[in-house]
Amino acid sequence: MKFFLDTANVEAIRAINELGVVDGVTTNPSIISREGRDFETVIKEICEIVDGPISAEVTGLTAEEMIAEARSIAKWHDNVVVKIPMTTEGLKATNVLSQEGIKTNVTLIFTVSQGLMAMKAGATYISPFIGRLEDIGADPYQLISDLRGIIDLYGFQAEIIAASIRTAAHVEAVAQLGAHIATIPDPLFAKMTEHPLTTNGLKTFMEDWASFKK
């Protein structure tokens, strides 16, 4: 399974990338806006840190706007993946872009039919949202399972990026269900390395070693 970082904070990306577990990065307009910096500059900086797919999202609403913006974004770096919203206009754009060899990540997927449509249109990645589905009482895990089953059954080349990840339990569950990728907020990465028993165990080891060295 691959781990992507869901952030545009360059310093956080640089620090977490040193762990050797980061395979890519995802961003969206909300994440970019929180940084208060130029969109293109941020994406290019991220591409220099992480050697993997870097998702950058369009902001246009029509297919024509998305296509024009995507063509421009795709030129920023070979690792850039253009993020497209799951709408009818987004599907039109994805179809055109896929034929041009531009990698796409179709986002805001909440149903199997949406995921299937995105894959049919040629999406490189599809991003179902875990936390947001839980917020409305829906079962995000069934969605992941169903989408993975469809990919395996029909041979679609798209990969599932489990998004809207909020807890380590989310990561563990989607890993078991066959999501190819989990995109994880930077604060959660730190929490996933920690456990009180690990901390206490290390403390005991060090205390015992200090006593022995005396």
Swiss-Prot record:
Signal peptide: none annotated. It comes from the Bacteria. One of its GO terms (cellular component) is cytoplasm. It is found in: Cytoplasm. The active site is at residue 83. It catalyses: D-sedoheptulose 7-phosphate + D-glyceraldehyde 3-phosphate = D-erythrose 4-phosphate + beta-D-fructose 6-phosphate. Keywords: Cytoplasm, Pentose shunt, Schiff base, Transferase. Its EC number is 2.2.1.2. InterPro entries: Aldolase_TIM, TAL/FSA, Transaldolase_3B, Transaldolase_3B/F6P_aldolase, Transaldolase_AS, TSA/FSA_arc/bac. Pfam families: TAL_FSA. The keyword Iron-sulfur does not apply. GO terms for molecular function: aldehyde-lyase activity; transaldolase activity. GO terms for biological process: carbohydrate metabolic process; pentose-phosphate shunt. SUPFAM superfamilies: Aldolase (SSF51569). Pathway: Carbohydrate degradation; pentose phosphate pathway; D-glyceraldehyde 3-phosphate and beta-D-fructose 6-phosphate from D-ribose 5-phosphate and D-xylulose 5-phosphate (non-oxidative stage): step 2/3. Its main location: cytoplasm. Transaldolase is important for the balance of metabolites in the pentose-phosphate pathway. Belongs to the transaldolase family. Type 3B subfamily. This is Probable transaldolase. The lineage of its organism: Bacteria, Bacillati, Bacillota, Bacilli, Lactobacillales. The gene is tal.
